[in-house]
Amino acid sequence: FLSQYLRLQLFLSPMRKYLNYLLVITLISSCASEPESRNQVIETTSIITSTTSSSTSTTVQKVKEDISYDEFGIELLDVSPEMKEQFDELVKYVEKKTGLSFVEYPKFNLYTLDGYRDYNAASYLDDFDKDYEEGEWERAVLSENMWGLIESTPEKMKELIVEFQRCASAGSYNLLDQILRVPVEKNQKKLNLWEQSVIVHELVHSLQGQIVGLSDWYSTMKENDDFMDYPGRRSIMEAQADLVQGYWMAELDFDQRQDMTSQRPNFRCSVSLPAYFYIPFDLYYDFGGRLGKQIHTMERMEGLNKALFELPTAEQVYSPEKYFSKEPY
């Protein structure tokens, strides 16, 4: 029910040897900085009871502002008590619909839309420098040019992917730091319906992360340079998250759905990447969704919970009948 550019993405570290650079979407970690203080000059005027004179004095007061930032210096929005209550209710909703329980309260960061986009770009660039050895990116792009896959220079290709990071996501859950990140309106007491729908989706991923132990699982894959299990688990995870989000949206009445549509931010994303770049996303969100619906039809939510561990291969995601045959592929 969301277009390709609005698909809610479960971000991962860049894997330079996985699918020949098909997946270069990254979000790694977030932390809060110390609150900052600033000096504010306040002018005070004292009127002396006299017909001849008055005096003005200037005093300096230290005003403390409790503002938190992530590790890239991007502001994190405060969570009002009303938002926290909404978040608590959404946590309960996700637990009820999945039949699973959080081991610990999910971690989350709230940003403005611009702040969220800045975080996506900054975190990608941070990991890009760590993940690619000197000259490796240039050689990869040159190879793709030789095969006729792209016509971009290494620098232009990098710029396109960075912009894709900025604009293509409505919310995210990070496998490694286990933090849910969502852009919300600033200076509001309550989350609007659109924001809640995004949080429901990402809360499912947060729950999956705790139940499956995704952080350790992903770290082991990266250490062993073996990502064969990734497509199957990612597909099931997205299918389950889409399903629970769909449940939540289905409970809205007509007016609420109209409101939610009007609350959706402008996610314009005019970036055009090479066609092969989107192949994994078609696997996760399209074919994975089809497999997830079939599993749910046959075995309800218990079947999807089981599938988080009994992983399909990429071939079985494309051909669900092979998954249900229980034959090895």
Describe the role of every protein-language-model region.
Residues R117-E138, E155-L180:
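Catalytic zinc-binding patch centered on the HExxH motif and its immediate surroundings
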Residues R181-V200, G232:
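Short pre-active-site segment immediately N-terminal to the catalytic Zn-binding motif
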Residues V198, E202-Q210:
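Catalytic glutamate of the conserved HExxH
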Residues I211-S215, S219-T261:
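Post-HExxH zinc-binding segment in Zn-dependent metallohydrolases
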